[in-house]
């Protein structure tokens, strides 16, 4: 039997579901090495079918859209195994869930457990350890100017003044590096507005974090961006629509 050209073999593998790739790691060393290559991971993300997580009090569902580019797309619904899912016993009350690259990060300000890194498709959970359990997660991203992808979490801690002059706690914005397990405090202007808006509804896209933010004393809105490569918050664009509802949501579709 004539083997397939390697380029074709790699192309076929990049179109398979993540669950299948995990099983295929043991087929041969070449495939095992391939699945860790950055170019393969990038192609796999680009070709992945849109999937959603739907949570109820009793079950957690995976919703997959098949044939989205065709004239008659279909929806495939299946129940996910809920064993080991972070904060499942809490029924996700007081839980903040943010997403990046198909992974979910679960955090609760009311629990001493901290933040969980959750891969719902492979049923894998890893708890992110940090010394201060009072870290409140706002969103996550990574430095998109580097070759290696190191996830970073944007959030804040409740801190006392360093000189101990007061028992009044105040919010300090910080970045948690998932590789070095280190915190870095940063200064943000209009901090109160920043923390309220980014914690409510934020979207991670290509390493940066985006969210809707009202312009104080006006009815106008803009999209704010936190750039993890420069570790700064900056305006992205002014929205043409004005404020009209109490709930405004920013979403991304197929990475755009």
UniProtKB/Swiss-Prot annotation:
Question: Which Cys pairs are S-S linked?
Answer: none
Cite a single Pfam family from the UniProt record. FBA_1
Q: Which InterPro entries match?
A: F-box-assoc_dom_typ1, F-box-assoc_interact_dom, F-box-like_dom_sf, F-box_dom, SCF_F-box_component
- Organism in which the protein naturally occurs: Arabidopsis thaliana (Mouse-ear cress)
Q: Where is the F-box domain?
A: 1-44
Classification via PROSITE patterns: FBOX
Query: Do you know which NCBIfam families this protein is assigned to?
Result: F_box_assoc_1 (TIGR01640)
- Which protein are we looking at? Putative F-box protein At3g51171
Q: Which residues form a coiled coil?
A: none
């Amino acid at each position: 039997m004539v083997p397939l050209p390697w380029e074709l073999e790699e192309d076929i593998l990049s179109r398979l579901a993540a669950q299948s790739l995990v099983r295929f790691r043991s087929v041969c060393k070449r495939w095992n090495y391939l699945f860790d290559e950055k170019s393969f991971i990038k192609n796999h993300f680009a070709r992945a079918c849109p999937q959603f997580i739907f949570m109820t009090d009793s079950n957690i569902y995976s919703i997959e859209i098949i044939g989205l580019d065709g004239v008659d797309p279909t929806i495939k619904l299946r129940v996910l195994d809920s064993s080991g899912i972070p904060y499942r016993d809490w029924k996700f009350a007081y839980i903040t869930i943010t997403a990046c690259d198909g992974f979910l990060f679960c955090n609760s300000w009311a629990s001493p457990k901290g933040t969980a890194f959750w891969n719902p498709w492979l049923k894998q959970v890893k708890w992110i350890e940090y010394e201060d359990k009072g870290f409140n997660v706002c969103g996550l991203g990574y430095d998109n100017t580097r070759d290696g992808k190191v996830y970073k979490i944007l959030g804040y801690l409740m801190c006392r003044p360093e000189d101990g002059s007061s028992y009044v706690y105040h919010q300090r914005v910080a970045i948690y590096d998932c590789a070095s397990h280190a915190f870095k405090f940063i200064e943000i202007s209009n901090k109160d507005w920043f923390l309220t808006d980014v914690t409510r509804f934020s979207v991670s896209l290509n390493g940066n974090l985006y969210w809707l933010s009202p312009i104080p004393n006006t009815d106008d809105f803009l999209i704010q961006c936190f750039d993890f490569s420069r570790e700064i918050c900056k305006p992205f664009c002014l929205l043409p629509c004005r404020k009209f509802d109490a709930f405004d949501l920013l979403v991304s579709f197929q990475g755009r």
